[in-house]
Amino acid sequence: MSEKLAVNFAGLTFENPVTTASGTFGSGLEYSEFVNLDKLGAVTTKGVANVPWPGNPTPRIAETHGGMLNAIGLQNPGIDTLIARDLPYLHERNAKIIVNVCGRSKEDYVEVVERLAQEDVDMLEINISCPNVKAGGIAFGQKPEMAEDITKAVKKVAKQPVIMKLSPNVTDITEMAKAVEAGGADGVSLINTLTGMKIDVNRKTFAIANQTGGMSGPCVKPVAVRMVYQVANAVQIPILGMGGIQNTEDALEFLMAGATMVAVGTANFFNPYATSEIVDGLEAYVEREKLSSITEIIGCVK
């Protein structure tokens, strides 16, 4: 792999700017027959909580025009399984590891981050789209003061760089980015899914049991690119951009809008080779454009 693809994110060097979006790549094991995990900049795990979460009732997924809705409910086996099973597997394959963390309270997040402080993990991604059960169910990422507070709490105990995953379901995402930057975040990732709904007109009911779900896929990309651009012009910390990335051109849009790294999500479901193909495509682009480094295009659109 060309050294020209290397990027620095929050003080860490990644061989290329491509990772996986949490929840779309399992723990890496599920895709290992399609992708050499050490070829990716990093593997981002599915969200992990302090205890196993059962997830939402089924049906939990519905196809939509240009994407999909999901209401999995962050089902996961918990931090013990991640440490005992998933991390050793990723280490065997020389993958850089970003662990996505979820929780129902500030204490939940802190507990997981404290456990991970003892592990060989490269970076943490904190999912603040989770509902805060102690604040009436509002997501941590929907109020700036809550986002700043949770950022400060996890930064106090974290041993790895911390990036905060921002929800697009807010009035002004730049205010959320500024809040987590003030809380000490080392970076931000965006966007998480947009809230959507689909109705089954034949059954005259909701297409998914949870009624609403997170919308992802190509349909959200223009919103995601716009938000990445806005955040890049509002904060000084680096951005992991995501939302509808299917191919190299999509990834380039995010980089030019101001993202330092990109994450591929829904595309993994219909093309398990997507991440690997994008790495190859970026390498070809750098050579074709005669760039000395992929970083030359980051934020080039003003």
Predicted ranges, named:
Residues 32, 80-83, 87, 110, ...:
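Predominant activation on well-ordered alpha-helical scaffold segments within soluble catalytic domains
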Residues 40-41, 46, 122, 186, ...:
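Short acidic/polar active-site loop segments enriched in Thr and Asp
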Residues 49-54, 131-133, 195-198, 269-271:
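Short gly/pro/ser/thr-enriched loop/turn and capping motifs at secondary-structure boundaries
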Residues 55-65, 199-213, 255, 267-291:
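C-terminal helical cap(s) of enzyme catalytic domains, especially alpha/beta-barrels
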Residues 104-240, 246-257, 261-264:
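Alpha/beta enzyme core
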Residues 245-249, 271, 302:
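Small/polar glycine-rich anion-binding or flexible loop at a beta-alpha turn
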Residues 295-302:
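A short, charged, Gly/Pro-tolerant segment at domain boundaries
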